[in-house]
Amino acid sequence: MALKRVFLLRSVAPRVAALSTKPQAQEQPPASPEALRGCGAAKAVRPPVPAVDFTNTQEAYRSRRSWELVRNLLVLRLCASPVLLAHHEQLFQVARKLLGQRMFERLMKMTFYGHFVAGEDQESIRPLIRHNKAFGVGFILDYGVEEDLSPEEAERKEMESCTSEAERDGSGANKREKQYQVHPAFGDRRDGVISARTYFYANEAKCDNYMENLLQCIKASGGASDGGFSAIKLTALGRPQFLLQFSDVLTRWRRFFHQMAAEQGQAGRAAVDTKLEVAVLQDSIAKMGIASRAEIEGWFTPETLGVSGTVDLLDWNSLIDSRTRLSRHLVVPNVQTGQLEPLLSRFTEEEEQQMKRMLQRMDVLAKKAKEAGVRLMIDAEQSYFQPAISRLTLEMQRRFNVDKPFIFNTFQCYLKDAYDNVTLDMELARREGWCFGAKLVRGAYMAQERVRAAEIGYEDPINPTYEATNAMYHRCLNYVLEELKHSTKAEVMVASHNEDTVHFTLCRMKEIGLHPADGQVCFGQLLGMCDQISFPLGQAGFPVYKYVPYGPVMEVLPYLSRRALENSSIMKGAQRERQLLWQELRRRLRTGSLFHHPA
């Protein structure tokens, strides 16, 4: 079965007893001055944490020359103009024709490109990285080049790459759940998305090219500084059909578990707290005709159950990989028809090879990142890809996060199931003893996700309101912070431009007793946005990172378009940033420090 290939990435971890959902206190080894930061680090006595003031413009912009502040103001003001934004692509084209490419590129470097992009190649980005590092701000390196496709071309590529051979010839039509079926109305995944890069599958050679670019990005991260990050998207590494099919498998298998939980009177419980009685579960599966009682008893052994004697969702999920010989039994009941349906789809030989190469590319990147001492951040994507992306990331974490978290998963807190996803992954890391690495974001695909769910006809996966998303973000973050109070085997990045969320994090860190020097909590913002948050944090000793894209001017124009649109979509934050920039320029004029030189 083709999906077994997924788990070649995994090195089997020893099974220990199931734990509760609450982080449990653990005895820590004595602290030593030489202790490394992060996973496995011992916590030593630390100096007091300086107060962080996001209104002190002198400190916030200490790293910037006055002309840079003027450029920032100009760019942010242009991003606030609805007329300019509505026609910015046409304006770019006109400017390029009038000025010529050379002068156009120079103009872009003086404005939008210079504000949002670090440079054209690995050498040209080094001065900015060194400069920011001197003021306490690290980097997440990202090769920002994208294909500039027409909507029609993007739709054609998406339909071809997300449809299996069986679906094309009619034998596999409509087998997947609605959410995981490709739909022509949403073939252009860029539509309605303003803050995330999008890749479209062309062929295996193109995926190899992306991998080589990412390897160069990892090399640059390792050479530029210690402790850097690189970011990757799994849709750049292979045919998205596999991600859709695997996501469908994982979702249906999880839903089957919750159906049986409801039969045992456990409907509505948190996912990590739902535990099924083994004997009742075995009876239910046998009555459905999935397998004989004798076969089923072989599934649930002390090795898989620990000492709990019950089956939770983590035990249940493990059947797909650790018990792959049971693949012929992986069927689930169709609620509408009452019939048993196979869970795993059939792949052609070519499709299986494409999937295998995708997994190999992931493996190559993870190995290279670990060798270079670079942490690899797996970006989140659309909800119909995300179950597969999260599971593949988890398999990489099991293998590479033994001593410290090199692989970070991204959790989108606008999803209704975000808290379940965070708690389940954290629990699995505890049980198996590997290091948990997470980036928490609100999410980049909200408008597209809502429209798609309504149009195709499945439950909206997004929280109903912005306030509900904020509450979910803080709930997930608080859970991870409570874990950090007792364990050094986890790290979290608070990737947010929301000042209230950053304040919440700082307050909880102080209450819990987490020191910034321990390096377990870090912050992330985009280059060119929210310097008034990033630099005060960095100068106070908190680990903070800028998401730093690079690439040739003409090839990062799609990225620049999204940055302009994103600034317009978060007007409250951008307006505050403009006010602070004006305030600092007036202060410099008033005090005679207009020619301020950062030092």
Swiss-Prot record:
Q: Is Acetylation set as a keyword in this record?
A: yes
Q: Name one GO cellular component term.
A: mitochondrial inner membrane
Q: Name one GO biological process term.
A: proline catabolic process to glutamate
The protein's location, in the record's own words, is: Mitochondrion matrix
Biased composition, class Low complexity, residue ranges: 23-39
Pathway field of the UniProt record reads: Amino-acid degradation; L-proline degradation into L-glutamate; L-glutamate from L-proline: step 1/2
The molecular function GO annotations come to:
amino acid binding; FAD binding; proline dehydrogenase activity
Q: Where is this region: Disordered?
A: 20-39, 152-180
User: Could you tell me in which tissues this protein is expressed?
Assistant: Expressed in liver, kidney, heart and to a lesser extent in brain, lung and muscle.
Tell me the Pfam families matching this sequence: Pro_dh
The UniProt function text for this chain reads:
Converts proline to delta-1-pyrroline-5-carboxylate.
This chain belongs to the protein called: Proline dehydrogenase 1, mitochondrial
Species whose genome carries this gene: Mus musculus (Mouse)
